[in-house]
């Protein structure tokens, strides 16, 4: 029996979401559950795993005890022989008013997911000074009117980090006509929505025309149509780390040549939470299948 324990969805699917561009994650997950409902060996429950206890081996099998919180119920214990961690990552957004409210709707981190929809529009970069040159590399073929809002981070420390990454970073920004604004941002206000609900749903991409006003603690505001960001992220759940899974660069260590098994026998890590460094829906689907097929083959035939 396969037990899938699920939690809440992020706000939007990005442009790397197979053929489901613009589909809300809640519906995407609903459709996956509908398809899985035809298999009587799969059971899905809405619950949160808070702890994984490694019980060692019973013969040839790994054993685990899971502490699981169900809505409105006491914590339950569930046993498992194999565990697949699909816990994902979460972005660490700044507290600046307007960032979280508009995240994924004109403020984005992936130019290959959302950049084309804002091509040739006034673009803002939201990042520390030492991350700006890297963002410019990513969007240089899409936008020419670019402001870098470094939010007070233009100092000797970040300048040294920028020089370490790209010694000629100042000339590089000048070459691409990037204006660096070091003022402290007080708020990012949406002036216009770029919703494309009335666009032809058969099209793979349509322009989005958002508009924002960046306000500062001093001086005049600046208007931008979209923002490319560089914010840190973290594991959405710590259950893998608490179970002994090694973190490498903030990711769950997974061996891609062995079904994405972690350093803990019996525990696998898939999706963007693991160490193979890819963050999109097709990749998550692929890694899920790879882990499932691999661990399925680890059970003797009499248990299948």
What are these regions (language model features)?
Residues 122, 144-148, 266:
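Residues at the starts of beta-strands that form the adenosine-phosphate
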Residues 123-134:
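Glycine-rich adenosine-cofactor-binding loop
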Residues 1-39, 133-160:
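Beta1-alpha1 glycine-rich phosphate/pyrophosphate-binding loop at the start
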Residues 101-117, 230-278, 284, 290, ...:
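FAD-site-proximal beta/loop scaffold in flavoenzymes
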Residues 84, 291-303:
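Short, hydrophobic alpha-helical segments
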Residues 30-74, 78, 144-251, 301-303:
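A Rossmann-like FAD-binding core segment of flavoenzymes
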Residues 43-121, 253-258, 262:
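FAD-binding core/adjacent interface of flavoenzyme oxidoreductases
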Residues 82, 86-88, 93-95, 126, ...:
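Short, well-ordered coil/turn residues at beta-beta hairpins
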């Amino acid at each position: 029996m396969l037990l899938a324990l699920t939690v809440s969805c992020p706000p939007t699917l990005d442009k790397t979401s197979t053929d489901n561009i613009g589909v809300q994650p809640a519906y995407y997950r609903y459709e996956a559950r509908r398809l899985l409902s035809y298999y009587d060996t799969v059971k899905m429950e809405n619950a949160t795993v808070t702890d994984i206890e490694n019980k060692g081996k019973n013969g040839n099998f790994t054993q685990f005890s899971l502490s699981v919180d169900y809505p409105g119920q006491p914590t339950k214990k569930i046993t498992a022989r194999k565990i697949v961690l699909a816990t994902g990552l979460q972005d660490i957004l700044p507290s600046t008013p307007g960032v979280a409210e508009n995240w994924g709707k004109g403020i984005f981190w992936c130019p290959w997911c959302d950049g084309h929809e804002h091509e040739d529009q006034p673009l803002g970069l939201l990042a520390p000074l030492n991350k700006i040159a890297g963002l410019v590399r990513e969007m240089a073929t899409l936008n020419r009117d670019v402001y870098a809002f470094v939010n007070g981070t233009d100092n000797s420390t970040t300048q040294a980090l920028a020089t370490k990454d790209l010694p000629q970073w100042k000339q590089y920004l000048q070459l691409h006509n990037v204006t660096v604004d070091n003022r402290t941002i007080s708020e990012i206000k949406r002036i216009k929505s770029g919703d494309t609900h009335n666009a032809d749903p058969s099209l793979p991409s349509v322009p989005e025309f958002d508009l924002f006003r960046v306000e500062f603690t001093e001086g005049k505001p600046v208007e931008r149509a979209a923002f490319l960001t560089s914010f840190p992220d973290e594991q959405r759940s710590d259950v893998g780390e608490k179970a002994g899974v090694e973190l490498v660069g903030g990711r769950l260590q997974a061996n891609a040549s062995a079904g994405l098994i972690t350093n803990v026998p019996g525990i696998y890590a898939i999706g963007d939470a693991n160490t193979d460094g890819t963050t999109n829906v097709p990749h998550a689907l692929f890694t899920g299948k790879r882990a499932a097929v691999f661990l399925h083959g680890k059970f003797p035939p009499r248990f299948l």
